Amino acid sequence: MNGLFDTYHIRRAFSRAAHSYDTNAVLQHEVEQRLLESLDYLGDRIPRVILDVGAGTGRASIAMKKRWPKAQVIALDQAMPMLQEARKRSHWWNPLALIYGDARTLPVADASVDVIFSNLCLQWIEDLPTVFAGFRQALRPGGLLLCSLFGPDTLIELRQAFAQADAVPHISPFPSMPQCGDALVLAHFQNPVLDRDLFTLTYDDLSALMRSLRAIGATNALQERRTTLTGRGRFAATAAAYETLRNADNKLPSSWEVIYACAWAPTSEPMTRENNHEIASIPINSIPIRRRNSS
């Protein structure tokens, strides 16, 4: 096995979570709604083809189909049971196009898509520059990319608690905002704008948090993870370390950092160049972190 992530494990985890996902993905739905609102960047433009990468159960795809009924909305996911859930939501008189596929190798023609939308999918891919380059290639000139992904402060409390129990990695190394911005620039996207939120969810205990993660398919997919069950001793040590963070409401907090990115595929006009390098601005300095609490 090569690479940081076990892609087979990721596919299997999300396949198993297909039936429980929507009931438990409260945060994912909130982020999805915020990303959908960012489609206003299109102004009066009406997209003909929209690609939803990592579409899951198809909620966002259906929302975009409702907004632009004449557009072809393609829901792409690597977990077939997720697409089966999306098919149940899709209206027979104006259906989605459902495609089983991977964000790393988009099964669409070059310059054929007006909008690529991807909600909380790309943190499972280690080579963001290559993936973004594939997105740019699929977009028509001037096409829009809107995506969200988890940042490095996601599950930081759980990461630290596990670290006190053993030295085996349990949480993925999520990309930072500068890394996302650099990846967009390397892929030659224009005018990238990034933002972020820091959400705090709360749980009764560690077991409740772990059940919630399994229900949305967010399990440890690292290649170097321990493949045997976590022993009672290690789990107890992790739980004890986490207990020190219990808040005034007698709940355990769990941080989720979300990075949002908006960028445009180049038009036929060349980008600004300086010293033989293409220049793009990324306004990431002084971006506020908005803290939101939900339980």
Curated annotation (Swiss-Prot):
Protein source organism: Xylella fastidiosa (strain M23)
Function: Converts the free carboxyl group of a malonyl-thioester to its methyl ester by transfer of a methyl group from S-adenosyl-L-methionine (SAM). It allows to synthesize pimeloyl-ACP via the fatty acid synthetic pathway.
One Pfam family per UniProt: Methyltransf_11
EC number assigned by the record: 2.1.1.197
Protein known as: Malonyl-[acyl-carrier protein] O-methyltransferase
Family per similarity comment: Belongs to the methyltransferase superfamily.
Disulfide bonds: none
GO terms (BP aspect): biotin biosynthetic process; methylation
Stored CDD domains: AdoMet_MTases (cd02440)
Pathway listed: Cofactor biosynthesis; biotin biosynthesis
Keyword Transferase carried by entry: yes
Matches recorded under InterPro entries: BioC (IPR011814), Malonyl-ACP_OMT (IPR050602), Methyltransf_11 (IPR013216), SAM-dependent_MTases_sf (IPR029063)
HAMAP family membership: BioC
Keywords: Biotin biosynthesis, Methyltransferase, S-adenosyl-L-methionine, Transferase
Signal sequence residues: none
One MF term in the entry's GO annotations: carboxyl-O-methyltransferase activity
Keyword Transcription regulation: no
